[in-house]
């Protein structure tokens, strides 16, 4: 958009926000409200969504997907209306800022859709920050985090980034002082898994086994110690994801991916969140790059990433 209509000049604020992996996920029993309490450790990784928010002279919110997106979205139905999480974030910001002009959101997708990495949540976090800047709302990070929590359990973490412990339904975040870089390979799938379906499958498996579990109260301190020290070997021994077996039940090929990753040199691996993305831990950037290349030769889509990385950040602010 390169127009000045009367006194209106378009402006674009571009923000990037990271995807995440769960290096630990303990899931409690099904609650009466239909949710599950969790105790999780989130790690923001160097795979980013970008949102370019451009002011428009007319009211309303529009959304498009950038052709620069690195994902094959030909078979993916991404809603571009009020069902889209970025759209919802812009609507909340419009209400809070009482802004009278509209906004167009162009989303560059890089985080796998329905891959258990919070791509949609990253879009929402990026949109909150972009619209806050675009409309000069002047909200603090704490105020933005409060709005983020209204949008979904993973949105506050995409705003925060780094490493954090998540309790409750995952939205009660406490930053963890773990800044040592860890190197991972992400193996993405050409299909998605429904998070609610994965949780329902876990409930079914537990019921069939007569297994009862307690409400998770805290994460294993050994995980935080390993992350603080940057000790990949120590971390490999305490990786856990209660949802993993449910994800494998729904997508048995994930077991093969995990096995292949470890046979090709990963220290350890796990399904990230509800899947189907698989996260494989390595010792170094060089090891991660080599593993990603090897898995690519086996026909898998593998990406070398590192974490932790910061949360949503403005990368450009341009008057058009």
UniProtKB/Swiss-Prot annotation:
Entry's Gene Ontology molecular function annotations: 4-(cytidine 5'-diphospho)-2-C-methyl-D-erythritol kinase activity; ATP binding
Keyword ATP-binding: yes
Annotated Pfam families: GHMP_kinases_C (PF08544), GHMP_kinases_N (PF00288)
UniProt keyword terms in alphabetical order: ATP-binding, Isoprene biosynthesis, Kinase, Nucleotide-binding, Transferase
EC numbers, comma separated: 2.7.1.148
Active-site residue list: 20, 154
Positions bound to ATP: 112-122
Kinase listed as a keyword: yes
Superkingdom, taxonomy of origin: Bacteria
Any one of the GO BP annotations: terpenoid biosynthetic process
Pathway: Isoprenoid biosynthesis; isopentenyl diphosphate biosynthesis via DXP pathway; isopentenyl diphosphate from 1-deoxy-D-xylulose 5-phosphate: step 3/6
Enzyme class, spelled out: transferase
Swiss-Prot/TrEMBL catalytic activity: 4-CDP-2-C-methyl-D-erythritol + ATP = 4-CDP-2-C-methyl-D-erythritol 2-phosphate + ADP + H(+)
Protein family (similarity comment): Belongs to the GHMP kinase family. IspE subfamily.
Entry function: Catalyzes the phosphorylation of the position 2 hydroxy group of 4-diphosphocytidyl-2C-methyl-D-erythritol.
Protein name per UniProt: 4-diphosphocytidyl-2-C-methyl-D-erythritol kinase
Lineage: Bacteria, Bacillati, Actinomycetota, Actinomycetes, Micrococcales
